[in-house]
A protein has these predicted regions:
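A sequence-level/structural motif corresponding to short, flexible coil/turn segments enriched
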Residues: 1-255
Length: 255
């Protein structure tokens, strides 16, 4: 079931709810506060181990369900990330395929009522999945994740109408299991963090400016007002014996 929780600035619970509409698994992967002060939640709906739907639900700021939409392209469909776009819509990223690893990247654009505008199943090398999304200044959408069946770095860009701009599977010597987050850089280009805890700064053409291993931090990036980068996440000890939670701050080199 979905578990939703809202707190005040001190961490005191304002409201919480458990929500489900099926006898199978339903869970949330991401949520955002919308421009109108309410919330949209996305993830997976009615997962029985073989079939599932991508889900988008909107709640009021008091936790009341406003609407619910599901999307599917094949047996298994899941959303990992949602953004609200400059043109007043939503874009979702995840995968579509089977529950056993034959994945294509999935990108969906909807209007503010969750009604589908376009949906793209994007083929790359091996199984492919989008974990993170960002809207560019030109209004296109970049997805970051994995390709080559969990072994390589994946970037894809679609324009506002869903047309392809690029679709890149970067197969390197070391398995890194894909990107987990992408954010714009105030210095131009984008910062990305991958499963192997490598922070990469690329320019607008996808060319690498710098790449640095940041220890056991691999899930999320923020840029501070002074340009420093903070990366949070976890890693694994030798032999995959269990990870530690880390927070790393660093100053990128001057471009």
């Amino acid at each position: 079931d979905l578990y939703l929780l809202k707190t005040d600035g001190s961490g005191n619970i304002i409201w919480e709810l458990i929500d489900s509409g099926t006898e199978n698994n339903d869970w949330a992967r991401d949520f955002i506060e919308t421009a109108d002060g309410e919330y949209v939640v996305t993830g997976t709906w009615n997962d029985n181990g073989n079939n599932s739907k991508a889900m988008l639900r909107k709640y009021s700021n008091t936790g009341e369900l406003i609407w619910h939409e599901i999307y599917s392209s094949s047996a298994a469909n899941e959303i990992n990330e949602i953004i609200e776009t400059v043109d007043g819509n939503y874009v979702l990223g995840g995968y579509t395929g089977t529950q056993h690893g034959d994945y294509k990247a999935l990108m969906i654009k909807t209007n503010l009522d969750g009604q589908q505008i376009w949906k793209k199943n994007i083929q790359s090398t091996g199984s492919t999945e989008i974990y993170a999304l960002f809207e560019t200044p030109s209004g296109s959408y970049i997805g970051a994740g994995y390709c080559n069946s969990w072994r390589s770095l994946y970037l894809v860009e679609r324009n506002t109408s869903g047309g392809g701009v690029f679709n890149d599977c970067n197969i390197v010597d070391v398995n890194v299991s894909g990107y987990y987050d992408i954010i714009p850089s105030s210095r131009g280009g984008y910062y990305l963090i991958d499963e192997g805890s490598n922070l990469t700064w690329i320019n607008d053409h996808g060319e690498t400016i710098f790449r640095e291993y940041v220890g056991h931090a691999n899930m999320s990036i923020v840029e501070l007002d002074n340009g420093d980068i903070v990366v949070g996440g976890y890693g694994f000890n030798d032999g995959n014996s269990g990870g530690i939670i880390s927070l790393v701050r660093l100053t990128p080199p001057i471009n």
